[in-house]
Amino acid sequence: MESHLNEQQISDFRDAFSLFDKNNDGCISREELATVLTRLGMAPSQEDLQDMIVAVDEDGNGTIEFDEFLAIMKKKLYENDKGDDEEELRKAFRIFDKDDNGFISRNELSMVMASLGEEMTEDEIDDMMKAADSNNDGQVDYEEFKRVMMSTWNITEIFKPHVTIWRYKP
């Protein structure tokens, strides 16, 4: 089993961490965790959120720092084989890639999020694009999309066992 993450993996996990760390203070609070999970379509209770924090919070300070986040992501990365998810990812990418040019534009992202009932501000759309567009070309290719989605799946898999009931928003 691989025991070290490469620089790209660490960078990807730092990007994922920053999506949660809304105030950029270097830690994920219960409120920040709730915000992101709600955007992912989940509605965990306050008790569920506390259980999630406790499961990852090694130093017991009530928040998740990057080193704690990285340790659990590394563990999950090597526990899970995501090979079966490749076709699902390609299908999801095609849903976003409305003009079928191999890229997701900001406009396509905005349209799909709106069609899913996600009311997002222009700044939130910009933040999503910035987080996904690692080569800064103004669009998201399949590999960038896959990186973000795999990080999201790993994150939800980490927290799922600690939630008593996942309530998905209609």
UniProtKB/Swiss-Prot annotation:
Organism of origin: Oryza sativa subsp. japonica
Binding positions (Ca(2+) 2): 57, 59, 61, 63, 68
PANTHER family from the UniProt entry: CALMODULIN LIKE 3, MYOSIN LIGHT CHAIN 1, 3
Family: Belongs to the calmodulin family.
Family annotation (InterPro entries): CALM/Myosin/TropC-like, EF-hand-dom_pair, EF_Hand_1_Ca_BS, EF_hand_dom
Limits of the EF-hand domain: 8-43, 44-79, 84-119, 120-155
Sequence positions that bind Ca(2+) 3: 97, 99, 101, 108
Record keyword ATP-binding present: no
Keyword tags: Calcium, Metal-binding, Repeat
SMART domains reported in the protein's UniProt record: EFh
One Pfam family from the record: EF-hand_7
Residues the record lists as binding Ca(2+) 1: 21, 23, 25, 27, 32
Function: Potential calcium sensor.
Single GO MF annotation: enzyme regulator activity
GO cellular component: cytoplasm
Residues the entry annotates as binding Ca(2+) 4: 133, 135, 137, 139, 144
Protein's UniProt name: Putative calmodulin-like protein 6
